[in-house]
C-alpha cells in the first residue's frame, strides 16, 4: 500500500509524483516529475528507456537543486523504479509507491502526462525528441496558468516557495 502520510495530500509544498512516458513501440522514455501543490513539472529524456539506474540518476539530477524541500516522492511499482532507494538517498527524502491500479493516488502526474501528450502523442518515437524540445514543452506547461492555482502558473507558485 502507499502508506503516504496524510499531510502529503497535495496542499503542502514538497510532495512530488514521478512517472515515465513511453514512446510508440516502446521507443525511448521520458521521466516526468511533478510537485503536487504547485503542479511544477520536471522532465528528462531517458536514453535507455526504462532503465532503473539511469532513471534514478535523472530523478536526482532534476530535483537535487531543491533537495531541502523534498518531503515525499510517490511513484508506481514499475520495474524502472526499482532503484528507489538510490532516489530516496540522493534526494534525502522518502519514496512511496501508489497501490496498483490506483492512478488517483498520483493524480498530479497523470494530469501532467496528459498535458505532455498534447505535444508528444502516444505514437511518436521519443528517440527523435531532443533535450531542447523537452525543455520547451516543460516551459510551456509550467508557464500555463491553472485554474487550480487561481490562474497563477506552476512556475510562479513553485518559485514563490523557494524565496
Predicted regions and their residues:
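Active-site beta-loop-alpha junctions of metal-dependent nucleic acid enzymes
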Residues: 25-26, 43-66
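Acidic/histidine-rich, metal-coordinating catalytic segments
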Residues: 68-83, 101
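Short conserved beta-strand segments at catalytic cores or DNA/RNA-binding microdomains
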Residues: 21, 26-42
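Two-metal-ion RNase H-like nuclease active-site motif
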Residues: 13-23
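Charged alpha-helix within mobile-element recombinases
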Residues: 64, 88-95, 99-163
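Polytopic alpha-helical membrane proteins, predominantly small-molecule transporters/carriers
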Residues: 40, 67-69, 74, 94, ...
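Glycine-centered loop/turn motifs
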Residues: 10, 14, 123-124
